[in-house]
């Protein structure tokens, strides 16, 4: 598959480019309709860079909107947005799932991530291409969790999650998944992505379909 990854977070884009196998991958700031139309899948790295002032916040959100608009015009098949689990500000003893309401902190970077998701969800309701939101636990490091972080993802788990989302054809046009490395004090459930095959459009259902008698 031909995959375009948005530039802007060098660490994440390098991890994906160097570890996603079996695909043709390009990292680029050129998010014009003409360029996006050359790809099957677009991976947006949300607004994970630091946001320093309100003007930068506005530019980031406008950039997300423009990128999604170009995706619509280019008839791309799938868009994956890499977001962050940091937009949940619940107590440590809570176990959070994909259905929980986001509670962003009053801080520009956190707000920019949350607003990016809001725009993505609106496009998810309106346009027919497949849109997948992957909230990731940070920090992202290539080592096992030492149980000091309740929200942590090693690189292997992150890459495997993105690879699954690229390869699968989901039943629904919009889905949200959480990914973090499992630990004794994990704050976020990852059952949904662990059992992602159950959401495949290729999976035959087991409901009874009455046979219609031809007249």
What are these regions (language model features)?
Residues 139-141, 152-176, 182:
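Alpha-helical substrate-binding/gating segment
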Residues 2-22:
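N-terminal Rossmann NAD(P)H-binding glycine-rich loop of SDR-like oxidoreductase domains
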Residues 28-61:
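NAD(P)H-binding glycine-rich loop region in Rossmannoid oxidoreductase-like domains
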Residues 175-215:
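Conserved C-terminal active-site "lid" loop/helix of NAD(P)H-dependent oxidoreductases
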Residues 6, 45, 79-85, 134-136:
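SDR active-site strand-loop-helix element
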Residues 66-103:
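Conserved Rossmann-fold NAD(P)-dependent oxidoreductase catalytic core, especially the SDR/UDP-sugar
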């Amino acid at each position: 598959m031909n995959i375009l990854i948005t530039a802007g977070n060098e660490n994440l884009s390098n991890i994906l480019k160097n570890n996603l196998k079996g695909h043709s991958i390009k990292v680029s700031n050129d998010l014009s309709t003409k360029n996006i139309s050359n790809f099957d899948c677009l991976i947006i790295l949300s607004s994970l860079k630091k946001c320093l002032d309100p003007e930068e916040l506005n530019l980031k959100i406008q950039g997300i909107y423009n990128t999604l608009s170009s995706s619509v015009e280019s008839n791309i098949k799938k868009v994956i947005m890499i977001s962050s689990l940091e937009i949940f500000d619940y107590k440590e003893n809570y176990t959070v799932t994909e259905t929980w309401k986001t509670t962003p902190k009053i801080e520009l970077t956190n707000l920019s991530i949350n607003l990016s998701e809001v725009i993505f969800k609106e496009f998810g309701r309106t346009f027919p291409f497949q849109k997948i939101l992957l909230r990731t636990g940070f920090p992202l490091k290539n080592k096992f969790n030492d149980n000091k972080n309740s929200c942590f993802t090693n690189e292997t788990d992150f890459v495997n999650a993105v690879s699954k989302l690229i390869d699968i054809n989901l039943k629904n046009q919009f889905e949200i998944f959480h990914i973090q490395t499992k630990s004794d004090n994990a704050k976020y459930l990852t059952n949904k992505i662990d059992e992602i095959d159950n959401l495949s459009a290729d999976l035959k259902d087991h409901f009874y379909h009455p046979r219609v008698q031809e007249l």
